[in-house]
Amino acid sequence: MDGADGRLGVLMGSGHEAALSAEPTLRKLGPKPMRIPPVILLALAPGVLIPNLLAQNPTSPPNVVPTGVLSVSDPDLEVTLWAQSPQLKNPTNLDFDGEGRVWVAEGVNYRGHHQRQPEGDRIVVLEDTDGDGRADSQSVFVQEKGLLAPMGLAVIDNRVIVSMAPDIIVYTDVNRDRKFDPAVDRREVLLTGFNGRRHDHSIHSVTQGPNGQWYWNAGNCGSMFTDKSGRTFRIGSAYDGGRDLGWEPMKIAGMKSDDGHVWIGGFAARMNPDGSQVRIIGHNFRNSYEQTVTSFGDVFQNDNDDPPACRTTFLLESGNAGFCSADGKRSWGADRRPGQSVPVAEWRQEDPGTMPPGDVYGGGSPTGIAFVEDSALGPKYRGLLLSCEPGRNVVFGYLPKPEGAGFALKRFDFLTSNREGEFSGTDFQGGSNPQRQLKTLFRPSDVGVGADGAIYVADWFDPRVGGHADWDDTTSGAIYRIAPKGHRSRPAKVDLSTPKGAAEALKNPVLHVRAAAYNALQAQGPSAIKPVERLLKDPNPHVRARAAWVLSLDPRQGLPKVAGLLKDSDPQIRVVAFRALHQAAEKNVVADNSGSSRKQAPGSRAFFLETAQRLASDPSPAVRREVAVSLRDEPYEIAGPILLTLADGFDGTDRTYLEAWGTGATGKEAQVYGALVAKSQGRGAVQWTPALAALAWRLHPESSIRDFKARGLAESLSDAERKRALTALGFNASPAAADAVLEVAAKSSGTVKAEAMWWLLNRKD
């Protein structure tokens, strides 16, 4: 009995988990119910097995992972249970408002259980009204039969954006009572055409970025939609996600969209809040569950995979993750080359045109992601990236550090129930969970920062994750709060009615409170300039960045101040300034002084191009990266000289820089290649520097065939360099390229010959 009493203290954690008292039964979590005597239940500890968890009992409380099972990385922080079923069920996504409320999208009707709740799924609102650190109020904002496990939720002022395939739905709470009433409030389908009605590889959550645009993504089920500007996007892949909408995803793979580019699902995009001017910002994912956008405008995401190569990644603008072939017709497995590991093959890291995968950590099923800039955790955690990984019972933490043109992502377990790494109930462990341990039931589905600055984590709670399965018939869920020990919930008052109040709200820890502040300042016009300008002196660089984005809205007073930030000592602030000026130029907010001797005004296209040429020699690779990707749709006559300057700054090894540069050369590869080789002072292909060889490899136009054949045949080069030359030839569709590979195969031996033969046998078409 002494041992049982000791374990009970661990089980009960902070005392909030009365739901796991000495109840003789737990709820049914699997197909084989059984009874557990109270003495056994009392003895349960995190590492003790829970045999085939148990029979249903209408009077028993819902299940929850006790806080004593959870551990947080910092001893100065504590985990408390903020909410649990029946206050919420099966949480798929969270968002937060400025008053401290947590909004939850539920997924009771998930996949095979789509009829479990005939009234449809809900968006619920939870609140801690007495400040004791525990939700005590619950209401339902909306419940509809058409809501079947919605995968995304955003709350921006009185607009509630729900991602429910095939639609992005915007509810406007006109009277702000947090209860949708169709007689008073508005419901609009903003965009439609996302395949996968009951599939979690479809449309995911919307996030407002610091530039006022909405960011969102969809998995690889396929999408064909028309934005409010009238442009249609056709995004398929080699994955058959069903035919819910009357077209086949695999048949639209490789088709051009109306923006002139070929995009492969999954993908991420940004657009104006009215659904116009969609721009794809990354593609060829498997199923990225969510994205997070920093105040600098950097985008981070995670992506689940065919085990074992899940990843957390900095998303390069227009980046190709490489899950399918460039035309979307073939899976990564069909193109896997001899000697390639799964991570290298799956994210095509030896192919030109694919971005670095970031942190590839193995099997899993990543879900929600958040970037922490302002929180109760203090300056130590400013810039903390959090990524939920339910397959591993953990919320990963990263503190991204600039590294070349990208970021170093060093992973640690921020919050976990499974320090031992004994996983079960996941695809990478075979799917089944015959030995269900309490520590493996923690399935974090989303994470974010609340109005009190604490971190909130939603728990799906289930023995199974992945494979479109859920085994918890109780549909239990919970929300945990991570904060400094003794933290009291005191959300700051938000006043968006005045420029001063709205400017102050730009410092709020809640992402979409800051978004509402941006929108309010935009509506207030020039009167907002002075209070926002003061924020440029804030010691927090994220606050300075937010101010820059708001100032870029004003052509006369604001944009010149943003232009002044191009000389800032912080490279990230220079990145923000350049991005803001580029996006202003895209919107044509300022006319060019064509034919005039007057200096070009910030915000004009001419000023943007002058700035791009100047910053092509910036000491920061990150700044030069942004210059490179901004040139994608520019003609060679404009982009060529800038790209050649950027080429001089390539160190020969920085893959993010190389891909950014290649993105800038899109559609003009042959011209850039010719100029690049001409600039090499007559060096033959075999004598190319490593930097020139990599740049040429990234371009690989038809005019490069002779040069790469020479490199493939050159025994003076390493086998790795010769195989890289074969890759450049293999990615060229010209018959001359096939002849070149054949010649290399005939005249080589060993691994080079084997590589050449692979290309010949696998590119017969």
PLM regions and their residue ranges:
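Ser/Thr/Pro/Gly-rich low-complexity, intrinsically disordered segments
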Residues: 1-3, 7-9, 597
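Bacterial N-terminal signal peptides that target proteins for export
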Residues: 29-41
